[in-house]
Regions:
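GST-like domain detector, emphasizing the conserved glutathione-binding G-site
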Residues: 1-190
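GST superfamily/GST-like fold recognition
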Residues: 193-203
């Protein structure tokens, strides 16, 4: 026996359901938005994040994640990555190197993701009790740099022999084991007691 509950929805019913609009300014994060307010006034915005169009750049992502986690109102300007085309002239005037990310805070342009995070902590405070310069965060930040370097050495640079490739792979695997050990040192899923700057940096 067929009931009305088991009948498929009509096209008209489906269209009515599709009219839902996501609040990209105050709702969940989304890579397409150009403004995030978290319920505050647009006049409160002190920060502009310059990031890649497609939300692929890991350095942009960690600054983006920090702003989202701290719920700091900010604007987003999207910039072409070097590997995808010509850098916009307006951006090269603002950031001559053309590198991403960049952040404008109260009119001052800051580059390099770690320098940006330090400036954000100075302006708005750390995500929790552990900031970028905390003695508990520093060795883990160094481990993240080792992980990145090991990954790049293994996968991004050409090797001259199979033996050299194997050595790079083993080095990367060894660093991953160190990361796993660091994660296992806390009872929860984060590098320290709670989600914080170290997790943002590893993201």
């Amino acid at each position: 026996m067929i009931t009305t509950k088991s009948l498929p929805l009509s096209w008209e019913e489906l269209q009515q359901l599709a009219t839902f609009e996501r609040d990209t300014v105050n709702g969940p994060t989304n890579s397409q938005t150009r403004l995030r307010l978290f319920g505050q006034a647009e006049s409160d915005v002190r920060v502009t994040l310059y990031r890649d169009h497609h939300a692929w750049c890991p350095y942009c992502q960690k600054v983006w994640l920090w702003l989202e986690e701290k719920q700091i109102p900010y604007r987003i300007e999207k910039v072409t990555m070097f590997c995808y085309g010509t850098k916009e002239k307006w951006y090269k005037q603002k950031v001559p190197s053309g590198m991403l990310p960049a952040l404008e805070l109260d009119g001052q342009v800051i580059t390099e993701s770690d320098d940006i995070l330090l400036a954000l902590e100075d302006a708005f405070g750390p995500l929790n009790q552990v900031g970028m310069g905390d003695r508990r965060a520093l060795p883990l930040r160094q481990l993240e740099r080792l992980l990145f370097r090991g990954w790049c050495t293994w996968l991004c640079y050409p090797t001259r022999s199979q033996r050299e490739d194997q050595r790079s792979r083993e080095q990367f695997t060894s660093i991953v084991a160190q990361v796993e050990t660091a994660l296992a040192n806390t009872p929860g899923p984060y590098f320290l007691e709670e989600f914080g700057i170290v997790d943002v940096v590893f993201t």
